[in-house]
């Protein structure tokens, strides 16, 4: 299946082209978008190094705005960051005219940096539309185009068959939980890894393993926690005829079977966070996940892969693909870098009508920019053992190891 491209099938005569097609193809509109992108380039190019506030007056105005933001929100922003609306790759200008280096990228949301011309163009093109926010009751072409693009990438090495968009990562997780509950009703328990993070709705705050995120909340979700892979513990366990890794995995399997035997038929899903971010940048070998997923398959427990934070950021677009687990996943959640979030699922997990809805699935610019992001990732030199992500990872880890060697303990 190829990505939808209405331009490729447009009739040649204007009489048989929609007004929408004619507007988007208008020379005046195309020239205006070109001019906008070029103007962004010109101003963005001037931001090439960090600098302080441009004046005491701007700094004072910035501080006052931060204070006002905190008063309105009920708490100050996590960081004293109010952007001016322009940047240049890793450089971003703040409201006071100072320029900072962005090492956070909104936790992967702004993967391509600030004022990326291709994304500015995609957002400008998205503004040529009759509505701002799309949903299942009023949908233009963009949601289906983005969904198909995501699904085509996911289907390359998995059994995933459907993609359902939503407007936040935690909503993707909520949708995934409902899909798993419905498929395995009346099972009501959930298995998750220790130190996982799921989002901040009332249900996801209960599943996420952070007590501070559920203070004062009534507890209604039954969660059993599994230990995530611990390389240091595995190394300590290495002895005799079995490696430490194998021993650790065997212990984890025993723990999982203890849960499934204690609560037979009561678990709807096991949430696999293949790389833990909030929990401390924890990783695990493929064998660890595969063995646990095999137990889940035997016990008829859904294998749910939460990639809201990791999507697009490993050596392949999907972390399940990087780890060779495409044959095991039943449900996958993505977000952040994709701009619009989504749940993907196999045909066996396609829910009954009424369970999911998309009244407010995403804005035009998020849908358009998300599509461009995935196109750039899919066609650029980003993936594989020699791709840009792998090369950057090696540079980073080499420096970390050098620092650790220089400052042991």
Residue ranges and their predicted role:
Residues 2-409:
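Conserved N-terminal phosphate-binding loop of PLP-dependent enzymes in the Aspartate aminotransferase
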């Amino acid at each position: 299946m190829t990505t939808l491209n209405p331009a490729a099938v447009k009739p040649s005569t204007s009489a048989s082209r929609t007004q929408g097609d004619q507007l988007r193809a208008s020379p005046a509109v195309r020239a205006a978008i070109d001019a906008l992108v070029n103007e962004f380039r010109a101003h963005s190019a001037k931001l090439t190094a960090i600098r302080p506030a441009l004046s005491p007056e701007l700094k004072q105005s910035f501080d006052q705005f931060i204070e006002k933001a905190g008063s309105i929100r009920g708490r100050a922003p996590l960081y004293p960051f109010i952007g001016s609306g322009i940047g240049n790759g890793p450089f971003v200008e703040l409201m006071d005219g100072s320029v900072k280096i962005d090492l956070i990228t909104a936790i992967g949301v702004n993967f391509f940096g600030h004022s990326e011309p291709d994304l500015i163009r995609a957002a400008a093109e998205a503004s040529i539309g009759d509505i701002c926010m799309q949903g299942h009751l009023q949908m233009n072409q963009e949601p289906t185009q983005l969904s198909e693009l995501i699904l085509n990438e996911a289907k390359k090495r998995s059994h995933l068959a459907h993609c359902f968009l939503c407007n936040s990562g935690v909503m993707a997780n909520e949708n995934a939980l409902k899909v798993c509950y419905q498929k395995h009703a009346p099972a009501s328990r959930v298995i998750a890894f220790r130190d996982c993070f799921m989002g901040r709705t009332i249900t996801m705050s209960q599943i996420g393993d952070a007590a501070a995120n559920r203070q004062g909340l009534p507890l209604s979700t039954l969660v059993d926690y599994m230990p995530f892979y611990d390389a240091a513990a595995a190394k300590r366990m290495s002895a005799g005829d079995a490696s430490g890794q194998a021993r650790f995995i065997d212990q984890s399997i025993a723990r999982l079977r203890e849960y499934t035997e204690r609560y037979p038929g009561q678990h709807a899903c096991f949430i696999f966070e293949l790389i833990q971010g909030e929990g401390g940048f924890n990783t695990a070998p493929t064998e660890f996940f595969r063995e646990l997923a095999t137990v889940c398959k035997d016990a008829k427990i859904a294998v749910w892969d939460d990639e809201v934070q990791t999507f697009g950021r490993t050596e392949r677009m999907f972390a399940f693909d990087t780890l060779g687990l495409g044959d095991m996943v039943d449900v996958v959640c993505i977000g952040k870098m994709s701009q619009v979030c989504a749940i993907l699922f196999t045909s066996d997990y396609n829910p009954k009508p009424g369970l999911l809805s998309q009244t407010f699935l995403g804005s035009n610019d998020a849908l358009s920019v998300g599509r461009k992001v995935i196109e750039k990732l899919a066609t650029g030199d980003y993936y594989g053992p020699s791709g840009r992500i792998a090369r950057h990872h090696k540079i980073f880890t080499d420096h970390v190891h050098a620092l650790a060697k220089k400052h042991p303990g």
